[in-house]
Amino acid sequence: MKRIVFLLLSFILFIGADAQIYSDKVVGKNSAQELDSLSVAEYPYLLPIWGEKVTQLGFDLPYSAGVSVQYVWQESDLLIDNLQVGFNNGNLFALDEIVRFKNATAITNGVNVRPDFWLFPFLNIYGIFAKSENQTAVDFGVYAPGSFEVVDGTLNWEWESVMEAGTTARFDATSIGFGVTPTIGVGGGFMAFDMNFTWTDIPELDKPAKIFIFGPRLGKTFQFKRPQQNIALWVGGFRVKMNSGTSGSLLVNDLIPGFDELVTSGLEKVDQRQQEVDEWWDSLSDIQKKRPENIRNYTTSKAKLGVAGAALDAASRAESVEYNLDKRPENMWNFIVGSQFQYNKNMMVRAEMGFLGARTQLIVGLQYRFGL
């Protein structure tokens, strides 16, 4: 399942937040001179809309356009379920109980470029263009009924592994998207609510992966003595929602090494379990065979073994594999802390760290701003 699962599950979460800039309402007695200069100043740029009016009300606006470049590293745990697999364009087997994923971890290294502009004094709009190198590691097993026994006249069984495997996939991806950031600042304190939508193209997927990211932030900017120079600190959250359905088709040659041997071993174990469950049933008395719980346990175990055996038998003759599955982040939210140093109103450098919630990420970036 090297690409059936892993290439499909690796969602590209390298789309970081924009540099932390905002329209700041100047307040306080120490800022009286700055307020006076803002109230009479002519705003020289086309954007944002209402820029001159807001400036005269005492807001210090950032330059209206900019471009930023960011490097993003991220590691995230994934959950996979509702797996269906078919072979040679045949019928799909529902294998959610049969194939179980133990660990699925996606690691991404990416660079994104973001051009942006302020449409209104409190609304920033930006585009996203990104490239990434990705790696997904998954451990999984094929399970079937086993450990058959009779306890007080009742048939019992447990799920047991008939095949264990793990693999790592590596691939490149390209993303495009757009975002909006409503934000407000008063006296150096600020709130920002970053939202973006991206479409990520992975050659092995039938359709692009769609991702929505929401990142609320709350912070404070501290001014230095040098004009226009400051440092901002913030905390916040990072929420990821992605389209969960994934489907595609792959050649068996792209599967894990030793696939044929693993399938053959799995078939032998399933055949052995089928013999055991029949012996288990035959050991019951006629009265015990009429118990509803025994009938249910016997028919259920036979059905599950039948599905596992049919899937493995089809896999042993397969040249291609078709699949459907659902995947999602183990946790949608994680916590973030960040900082930005503004050298002047043109140049900023920032860093942000995300952790907790089964996701760890690091973002570093450089931004250049200009009037438009």
Question: What are these language model-derived features?
Answer:
Residues 20-79:
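Outer-membrane beta-barrel biogenesis signature
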Residues 21-24, 54-65, 117-122, 184-191, ...:
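Short loop/turn motifs that connect adjacent beta-strands in outer-membrane beta-barrel proteins
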Residues 63, 105-111, 170-178, 206-214, ...:
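Residues that define the transmembrane beta-barrel architecture of outer-membrane proteins
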Residues 65-70, 125-127, 189-195, 214, ...:
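Transmembrane beta-strands of outer-membrane beta-barrel proteins
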Residues 69, 113-119, 127, 178-184, ...:
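Residues on the lipid-exposed face of transmembrane beta-strands in outer-membrane beta-barrel proteins
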Residues 71-77, 129-135, 184-188, 195-203, ...:
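Transmembrane beta-strands of outer-membrane beta-barrel pores
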Residues 79-86, 137-144, 202-209, 245-252, ...:
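Outer-membrane beta-barrel translocator domains and adjoining extracellular loop/strand segments
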